[in-house]
Structures are given as structure tokens and as C-alpha cells.
Amino acid sequence: MRSQWVAKRRGQSNVSQMHYARQGMITEEMDYVAKRENLPPDLIRQEVARGRMIIPANINHLNLEPMAIGIASKCKVNANIGASPNSSNLEEEVAKLNLAVKYGADTVMDLSTGGGDLDTIRTAIINASPVPIGTVPIYQAVESVHGNIEKLTPDDFLHIIEKHAQQGVDYMTIHAGLLIEYLPLVRSRLTGIVSRGGGIIAKWMLHHHKQNPLYTHFDEIIEIFKKYDVSFSLGDSLRPGCTHDASDEAQLSELKTLGQLTRRAWEHDVQVMVEGPGHVPMDQIEFNVKKQMEECSEAPFYVLGPLVTDIAPGYDHITSAIGAAMAGWYGTAMLCYVTPKEHLGLPDAEDVRNGLIAYKIAAHAADIARQRPGARDRDDELSKARYNFDWNRQFELSLDPDRAREYHDETLPADIYKTAEFCSMCGPKFCPMQTKVDADALTELEKFLAEQKNKEAIAH
């Protein structure tokens, strides 16, 4: 779809959506996003120019269907996939991608850490994906030196980052905000550093006693991103790994640096979103969102959860969807899903499904709470279908039609029950929605009540 769009841009020194937006241009991607979001094209351009919205759209990802991440657009959901040293299969990863897209993922991150040819897997995912693909290039950098983190050089990082950009990756998590002087701040934490990328950078700095190479070479990463229109997803290496550690000095120190890096990227017209926690008690979620907006000049916020309690392994798609809905309500632009397998193991297809649906619920609930135009239309349509006992229409409008139909048909599988005025919960005689109050009956009732009121007034 985008071949002709990007052909005229090739060879330019900066091909980012922000660059064109700041020149007053409405690109084809901006126009496409405007139609998807039901927003004016110039509003999209203004938000991208301002940095409050990004359109992750690498010029080499030609089959991408452009989408937006930002406060003015609908709340988005990301799903993670990826091969590991213990589980790696190209066909499986493409199947996971297709499953994620089926259940509503707005973007997908390939977090492959080994076990196969990572370049082949990544390229296959990009070629098959209509949604933006994100990566964490530091994982492949570590794999390239067989896990010997201390052997990595700044050039190794830059080489892998450019390779991902050439392959068509739309956004990359770059852990540039973790400075060496912040490491002592984790001493009082219960769970230390829980970011994989952050842990890698921390280990490198502790070995070499040198500053974070992603920070010292940030301008070189900017130059790579300008050439391909890759968006920064600035990684929160010091995100809290438990509610005890939430909103501590380590987390907030890094956040301040992420804000500085955001503005540095903007000076070169490169798009940025900022990653956030993690594990956060409900009473601290609003503070975390507002603090990010303040420190990062309202760059889109992209949070993992957050989990609001730590005691429910096996149910962390629920503990985190609670926090995600609140974060979305307060202004977070994208939610990274958490599956029931979080903290326990590698998610399978059913885990991906359950995690995604939980997060689509959270994002949609946030859109309703933020009173986005049209956000509740689907809810109203489903409610009408429910009141009219139009079961097939209810299934069709559901976030997970297959699951809704499956649960209904467990007890009433025959087609005749698709028009029945009851389900197995109340049976044929006790469903309250059978009580249809027509307009004439209400008019008669209102007339009666008015007469009663008049009689009482006369009596007094």
C-alpha cells in the first residue's frame, strides 16, 4: 500500500512523519490515520508536529496500515511475541503475529532473544504484519556476542540498531535513560532492576565503569532513525518490578533523563514515545501518568500494565488490566498487554488471546471514560441487540465473538436458541429483559401519577 507513498521520499536525509508535519505537510500516512481515527487530517499533523502523537511507519515496512499513538487518538494496545532459546520456530512466530492481529493488537513487539536466526524471524514478521512492529535491539546485540555482555562495544549496539531499521522495524526500545549514577539508587529496592534491557546495560556499566553507551551515542541513533523514520520507544530500565518499588527515586531520576532525551530527539524531528511502569498501586497511577507528561513534554506514554498488586501469579492479565484501564483514563496513549503467564512462563496462543482481550477491554473502557467521540457507539449497539435478544448480533459486536458464542452454546447450542428471549442464566420465565414497557403504557402511567399528585395537593 505504501510503495508509492515512500518512493518519493527515498534519499532524503530525514523521512520522519514529524519532519513532514513540521513543514506543514499532511502525508498519506497522516491522512490514512485521520480516517481511521475519525479526526481532521490537520489535527493529526499538528499533534505529530507537537510530539504528542506518533505514527510509527518505517519507510521499509511497505505493507503497514498506518496507525497513531497519542492522547488525541484512541487508546492502543501492544502485544509481545518472540522466539526464545527454549522455544523458536519461524512459523510459530508468524502464527502468533496473526493471532495477535486477529484479537485486536494495534502494534506487535518482536522480543526474540535467541534460539534461531533472529534476522530471518524478524523479517518474516515484518513482511507479514499490517501493524507496526517494535523491537528491543539490545537483545540481538547480546546474542551476537553469545551472552558475553561485557564484550559489547558501542559500535555493536549501533550496528544492530541500523540493521533493524533497514529491515523495516517501526519503533525500537532504546534503554538510553539509565545513567551510571542511577545504579546505586536501586539498593533499597525489593526487586532491583527488572527490565531485561536495563539489566544488560547495568551489567555492562558495572563491568566497564563507563557511562551507558546508548546515552553517549544517542545522537548517532537519532541519525539512523531519521533515515528510516523509526520511532523511539524510550525504555524505562528502572521501572518498578513490584508495588513496593513504585515511584521511587530510581524510577523518577531515569524519567527526568527520558524527558531530556525526548526533547533532544525532537530537535532532529524524530518521533518519540516513552515507556512506563510496571507495578504501581492504584493510588499512584494518576501521579505516574501526570509526572511523565510533565517530565517528557507530553510525549505519548506507553505502559506495561501496570499491575496493581503482586499476589496473583496466573491472573496478572487481570491485576494489570485494572491498572491499564486507569492509566488509559488518565492519559496513557498505549498499553502493553500482560498475559496470565506473566512471571511464570512463555505464553501460548490461549494466553495471548486472554491477555489481548483483557487489554482491549481496558483500552476501550479508558476511551469511554475520556469521552472520546463515538467510543460508546459499539456498547450501545450491543445493548440494543441484547435487549432485543438478537444473539448473533451480540456475538458479532463482542470483543471476542468466538468466546461469547462458545459460552452461550455450552448450554443452549441449537440454532433455535439464537432467537430465544432468554439464556440459561434465567431461563424462559425470569429474564428481566422480557419486560418490555411500551410508550403508551408509560404515558398512561404518567397521567395517573399526575392525577394522584393533584389529588394529594388538593387534600393538603
Curated annotation (Swiss-Prot):
InterPro entries: ThiC, ThiC/Bza_core_dom, ThiC/BzaA/B. It catalyses: 5-amino-1-(5-phospho-beta-D-ribosyl)imidazole + S-adenosyl-L-methionine = 4-amino-2-methyl-5-(phosphooxymethyl)pyrimidine + CO + 5'-deoxyadenosine + formate + L-methionine + 3 H(+). Pfam families: ThiC_Rad_SAM. The keyword Repressor does not apply. One of its GO terms (cellular component) is cytosol. Zn(2+) binds at H279, H343. Binds 1 [4Fe-4S] cluster per subunit. The cluster is coordinated with 3 cysteines and an exchangeable S-adenosyl-L-methionine. [4Fe-4S] cluster binds at C423, C426, C431. It is an enzyme of class 4 (lyase). GO terms for biological process: thiamine biosynthetic process; thiamine diphosphate biosynthetic process. Substrate binds at N80, M109, Y139, H175, S195, R196, G197, D236, S237, L238, R239, E275, Y302. Its cofactor is [4Fe-4S] cluster. Keywords: 4Fe-4S, Iron, Iron-sulfur, Lyase, Metal-binding, S-adenosyl-L-methionine, Thiamine biosynthesis, Zinc. One of its GO terms (molecular function) is 4 iron, 4 sulfur cluster binding. Pathway: Cofactor biosynthesis; thiamine diphosphate biosynthesis. Its EC number is 4.1.99.17. Catalyzes the synthesis of the hydroxymethylpyrimidine phosphate (HMP-P) moiety of thiamine from aminoimidazole ribotide (AIR) in a radical S-adenosyl-L-methionine (SAM)-dependent reaction. Belongs to the ThiC family. NCBIfam families: PRK09284.1, PRK13352.1, thiC. This is Phosphomethylpyrimidine synthase. It comes from Rippkaea orientalis (strain PCC 8801 / RF-1) (Cyanothece sp. (strain PCC 8801)). The lineage of its organism: Bacteria, Bacillati, Cyanobacteriota, Cyanophyceae, Oscillatoriophycideae. The gene is thiC.
